[in-house]
């Protein structure tokens, strides 16, 4: 069996990773250099599927213009086109049985894809966005997501959808240093947007006032007139607009991949707050932070225990005051904080590794293929 997977990264991260490519490196070497940063899913599907001899796998990072040019240079019979054409050319060349379109680049042509390429037996996609519109995503055989509310929306429009929790790639631990004693206190790594992260904004602002928090917020800038300030004004969120000034002044920037894992591993605790519309926990940070053994402070949801035992493998809170109280307690009891993080790590490595994530994916694919 052969599988091709299409993925994409944000423009900012993709641009930074492009710097890894020089004139001397070809397509395969370029892939190796970019995936070595372990950003998002990287090439972890290929790693596990081929290690377990389940199927030959081709990973395609659509957002890398440098990789695209190198691929076409190695395939002179193909004329370089846009992102969709690039994906179609990759399919024509690789001839996969299974197409996992995580980037959803094939959506405009998904209805006719099997007619165009009769060797394709299964198409799948991923939806992790709470505000997505499944009624506009028809055509794939399988749909995967991370939380029940997204699954419910897909099932309601007739999609065959499955929850597949995120997984932690255990080999990351071979590329970072996890200190025996963590002296840094509390960190937050992520984004901050009006209309989506109002609770997150309040929590971070309160912890900032407590002088215990360091933050890396990837979607805010620095200065008087920034995109983030204009965004808050557009939403009429004047409290967030006011709060942005100190956030931007002391913001440490965007973190991704190995650098993100290494940073979280140096802290006793990290804040993990879901979007305002999310009813259940299920984001990537659960496995990322848990995988490096950092004690997580998570906004409580009804399915919390499906991931972590409260107060044993993670610390959950319902109100900002409760969070502040628990942060003070954990700072006064560093050994207990450390043990919670290590217990979470054991749970992640046992139940939520990336190998387990890939195994769940393939179980659904094989079930569809019969």
Describe each model-derived feature in a short phrase.
Residues 283, 314-320, 329-334:
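Conserved acidic donor-binding segment of nucleotide-sugar-dependent glycosyltransferases
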């Amino acid at each position: 069996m052969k599988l091709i997977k299409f993925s994409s990264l944000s423009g900012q991260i993709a641009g930074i990773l492009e710097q890894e490519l020089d004139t001397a490196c070809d397509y395969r070497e370029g892939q190796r250099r970019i995936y070595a940063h372990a950003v998002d899913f990287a090439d972890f599907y290929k790693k596990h599927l081929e290690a377990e001899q389940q199927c030959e796998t081709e990973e395609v990072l659509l957002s890398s213009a440098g990789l695209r040019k190198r691929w076409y240079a190695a395939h002179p019979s193909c004329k370089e086109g846009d992102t969709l054409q690039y994906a179609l050319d990759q399919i024509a060349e690789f001839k996969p049985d299974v197409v996992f379109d995580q980037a959803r680049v094939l959506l405009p042509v998904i209805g006719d894809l099997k007619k165009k390429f009769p060797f394709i037996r299964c198409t799948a996609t991923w939806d992790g966005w709470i505000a997505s519109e499944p009624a506009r995503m028809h055509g794939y055989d399988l749909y995967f997501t991370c939380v029940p509310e997204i699954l419910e929306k897909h099932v309601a429009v007739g999609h065959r959808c499955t929850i597949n929790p995120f997984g932690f790639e255990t080999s990351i631990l071979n590329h970072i240093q996890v200190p025996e004693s963590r002296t840094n206190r509390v960190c937050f790594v992520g984004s901050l947007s009006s209309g989506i992260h109002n609770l997150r904004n309040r929590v971070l602002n309160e912890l900032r006032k407590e002088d215990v928090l360091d933050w890396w917020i990837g979607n805010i800038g620095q200065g008087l007139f920034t995109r983030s300030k204009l965004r808050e004004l557009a939403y009429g969120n004047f409290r967030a607009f006011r709060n942005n000034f100190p956030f931007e002044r002391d913001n440490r920037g965007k973190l991704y991949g190995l650098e993100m894992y290494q940073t979280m591993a140096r802290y006793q605790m990290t804040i993990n707050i879901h979007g305002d519309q999310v009813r259940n926990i299920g984001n990537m940070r659960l496995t990322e932070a848990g995988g490096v053994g950092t004690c997580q402070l998570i906004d409580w949801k009804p399915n919390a225990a499906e991931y972590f035992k409260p107060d044993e493998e993670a610390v959950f809170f319902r109100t900002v005051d409760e969070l502040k109280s628990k942060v003070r307690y954990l700072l006064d009891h560093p050994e207990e904080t450390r043990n919670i993080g290590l217990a979470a790590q054991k749970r992640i490595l046992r139940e939520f590794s990336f190998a387990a994530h890939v195994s769940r994916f393939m179980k659904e694919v094989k079930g569809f293929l019969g």
